[in-house]
């Protein structure tokens, strides 16, 4: 917002959060609400109408089993998202957010600012600072994605948050996570999975996800069973 103010931006600004339901850290929405209040902007919360992230995994498995039973396919596929098929991001975040933005802003240009950084992955390291976003292009307006902190380090982010008198998500400050996404992420490190399991709020979804591992016989991550992360909780 400081940069936009300095550039003389006078258009509407909103924060938008796609809530993934049971798999979210419980503090994620309050963190967004606190940020919106500090910036003085409206927080728009969107959700997938057909159910949350866990519902998506469950329905994917149930549909696959039904096809297999009806001889419509020759092998079962895993219920989970994977690094190469991240429908968790595509369907429950990007698509839902883009749809909400098109409805809210039927005309004029839309700039979607995201907080990704090059340090986070090799894929993000290759992303441009600015690009056309086809998901938010409308007949009467262009769509763009802007990654304003692409070159920031983790320390830069922490220092900026503190300089504004705000505080970090409890996943960092209380449980020692190195990154925050879903409580249990298909791309999360073993350290972060264990950190998440240490939060009492995440125990119920942990057990539900392990139950799907058992039912499907597919591990949550290719080389790691979620059930092995915190077996004492089962």
Language-model-derived ranges and their functions:
Residues 1-234:
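Nucleotide-activated chemistry modules centered on ATP-dependent adenylation/adenylyltransferase
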């Amino acid at each position: 917002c400081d940069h936009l103010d300095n550039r003389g931006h006078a258009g509407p600004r909103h924060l938008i959060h796609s809530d993934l339901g049971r798999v979210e850290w419980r503090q994620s929405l309050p963190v967004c609400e606190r940020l919106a209040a500090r910036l003085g902007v409206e927080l728009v919360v969107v959700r997938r109408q057909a159910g949350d992230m866990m519902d998506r995994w469950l329905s994917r498995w149930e549909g696959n089993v039904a096809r297999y039973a009806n001889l419509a396919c020759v092998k079962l596929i895993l219920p989970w998202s994977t690094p190469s098929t991240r429908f968790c991001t595509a369907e429950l975040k990007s698509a839902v957010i883009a749809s909400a933005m098109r409805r809210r802003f039927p005309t004029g240009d839309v700039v979607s600012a995201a907080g990704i950084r090059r340090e986070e992955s090799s894929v993000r390291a290759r992303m441009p600072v600015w690009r056309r976003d086809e998901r938010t292009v409308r007949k009467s307006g262009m769509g763009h994605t802007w990654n304003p902190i692409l070159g920031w380090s983790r320390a830069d982010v922490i220092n900026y948050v503190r300089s504004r008198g705000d505080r970090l998500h409890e996943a960092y400050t209380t449980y020692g996570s190195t990154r925050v996404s879903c409580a249990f992420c298909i791309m999360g490190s073993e350290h972060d999975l264990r950190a998440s399991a240490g939060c009492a709020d995440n125990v119920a979804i942990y057990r539900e996800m392990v139950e799907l591992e058992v039912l499907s016989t597919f591990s949550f991550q290719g080389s790691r069973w979620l059930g092995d992360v915190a077996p004492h909780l089962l």
